[in-house]
Amino acid sequence: MCIRDSFILGSDPDADRVGIMVRTSDGEFKVLTGNQTGVLLLDYLIGAKQRTGKMPANPVALKTIVTTEMARKVAETNGLKCYDTFTGFKFLAEKKDKLENAGEGKVIFAYEESYGYMLGDYVRDKDAVTAALSLTEMAAWYAGQGMTLYDALLACYEKYGYYGEKTLNLVMPGLDGLKTVSYTHLRAHE
């Protein structure tokens, strides 16, 4: 299996988010959601650390409250704790620091559904560079197993279950909408 032409990566201009398209069995490219990409990365990272004997004691995965519960299933099935934070990498990084400084766990991966991924100890924020490197490494490893990333995603569904997702956008126009959003934000950050 060759990884050539099996996936396409794209980043935003400031390289903090990365998206991926994967070739399906019918030869077409499919855009993966941030949730799907995160689950693939989490499952791969867990397996890679287990295969190499580099899984830390008390391993942890972090996700935001709007990120798929499939991540929790992947983590807990493989012996990791999984914690939720509010949306935003500020909260993910704070939780990582708090857990690790207290000796309560070592975070191996953190993400949110909006295509942001935090790996390793290099950057305490979403980072498309380390994520792209890990996605490419993952694609190469699966190619060595005779699988594409699409095959790997389907295998994750078979192993952990099928999860649906739907994004809802609420529009609150005008001054009244601004007041409602502002009050909600203030209450959430008290």
Please report, for each region that a protein language model flagged, where it lies by residue.
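Phosphate-binding chemistry for phosphorylated carbohydrates and sugar-nucleotides
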Residues: R4-K159, P173
